[in-house]
């Protein structure tokens, strides 16, 4: 049966207390030591060819050197671990330096190698120590995915909108209950101003063209205007757009000559319509 738990140390021997601890700590993976492998004198990486990538569930590394945590070693531990596998590293630390420095350095190396959730744990008794040194242990986990792996994102299923019925497809006609008392009399909406007869159009608004005479029963005032024009001997053009060769026709009778066609009319402005007085047709007494 292939090993799933690996104990690695850079010393010549490994204490039996450490082996016992590993069997108890990783009981299911170690299977009472049947799936446990111990590797000593692992000063170099010559042993990396012993294990294929992603083949171990747990790797425990014990070191008697304060400077053991080289980046290439941590990367190798990440390679041989399965996704979701755990790594446990215990080393000696100088009491003068304290654990802060080694903690930051080792945690940085683990994160760069791809491990997650590094945390300080209780150290294992049985590792030889010298005066002025103390034990320090750190544990981390390999992510549950492989480096370079890919997976497809699941798209949420979009439910098709129910098609709306086409116009005229409904066979059920709505019932309309109309109360006759609710109907409004249209005549009640008209005011007295609306009922008044509109004013008759002025002579200028009559539909009769300028070249035709007023109708027989003219009521718009056009016949009266034509009668005034006949009495004065002026054309419609002379009244609507009066012009003067001498420039005195619009000033009044005091300035007009004896043959002026506008003689007898009130003063007016040249180019503007001449207004005829209402007493023009009144007989002189």
Swiss-Prot record:
Disulfide bonds: none annotated. Keywords: 2Fe-2S, 4Fe-4S, Cytoplasm, Iron, Iron-sulfur, Metal-binding, Mitochondrion. Residues 246-260 are annotated as: Fe-S binding site B. One of its GO terms (cellular component) is mitochondrial intermembrane space. It holds the Pfam family Anamorsin_N. Its main location: cytoplasm. InterPro entries: Anamorsin, Anamorsin_N_metazoan, CIAPIN1, SAM-dependent_MTases_sf. Signal peptide: none annotated. GO terms for molecular function: 2 iron, 2 sulfur cluster binding; 4 iron, 4 sulfur cluster binding; electron transfer activity; metal ion binding. [4Fe-4S] cluster binds at residues 246, 249, 257, 260. It is found in: Cytoplasm; Mitochondrion intermembrane space. Residues 1-150 are annotated as: N-terminal SAM-like domain. [2Fe-2S] cluster binds at residues 206, 215, 218, 220. A motif (Cx2C motif 1) lies at residues 246-249. Its cofactor is [2Fe-2S] cluster; [4Fe-4S] cluster. Residues 206-220 are annotated as: Fe-S binding site A. A motif (Cx2C motif 2) lies at residues 257-260. HAMAP family: Anamorsin. Monomer. Belongs to the anamorsin family. Component of the cytosolic iron-sulfur (Fe-S) protein assembly (CIA) machinery. Required for the maturation of extramitochondrial Fe-S proteins. Part of an electron transfer chain functioning in an early step of cytosolic Fe-S biogenesis, facilitating the de novo assembly of a [4Fe-4S] cluster on the cytosolic Fe-S scaffold complex. Electrons are transferred from NADPH via a FAD- and FMN-containing diflavin oxidoreductase. The C-terminal domain binds 2 Fe-S clusters but is otherwise mostly in an intrinsically disordered conformation. This is Anamorsin homolog 1. It comes from Picea sitchensis (Sitka spruce).
């Amino acid at each position: 049966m292939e090993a799933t738990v690996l104990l690695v140390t850079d010393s010549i021997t490994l204490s039996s207390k450490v082996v016992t601890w590993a069997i108890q700590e990783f009981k299911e993976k170690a299977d009472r030591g049947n799936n446990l492998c111990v590797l000593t004198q692992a000063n170099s990486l010559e042993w990396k060819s012993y294990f294929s990538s992603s083949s171990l569930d747990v790797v425990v590394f014990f070191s008697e050197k304060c400077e053991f945590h080289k980046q290439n070693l941590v990367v190798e531990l990440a390679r041989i671990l399965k996704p979701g596998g755990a790594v446990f590293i215990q080393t000696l630390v100088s009491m003068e330096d304290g654990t802060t420095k080694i903690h930051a350095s080792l945690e940085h190396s683990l994160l760069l190698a791809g491990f997650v959730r590094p945390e300080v744990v209780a150290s294992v008794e049985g590792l030889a120590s010298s005066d002025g040194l103390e034990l320090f242990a750190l544990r981390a986990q390999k992510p549950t995915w492989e480096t370079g792996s890919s997976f497809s994102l699941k798209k949420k299923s979009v439910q098709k909108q129910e098609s709306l019925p086409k116009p005229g497809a409904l066979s059920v006609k709505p019932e309309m209950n109309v109360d006759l008392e609710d109907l409004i009399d249209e005549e009640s909406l008209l005011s007295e101003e609306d009922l008044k007869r509109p004013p008759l159009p002025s002579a200028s608004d009559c539909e009769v063209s300028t070249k035709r005479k007023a109708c027989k029963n003219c009521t718009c005032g056009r016949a009266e205007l034509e009668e005034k024009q006949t009495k004065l001997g002026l054309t419609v053009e002379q009244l609507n757009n009066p012009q003067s060769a001498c420039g005195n026709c619009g000033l009044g009778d005091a300035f007009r000559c004896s043959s002026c066609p506008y003689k007898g009319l009130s003063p007016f402005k040249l180019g503007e319509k001449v207004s005829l007085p209402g007493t023009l047709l009144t007989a002189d007494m």
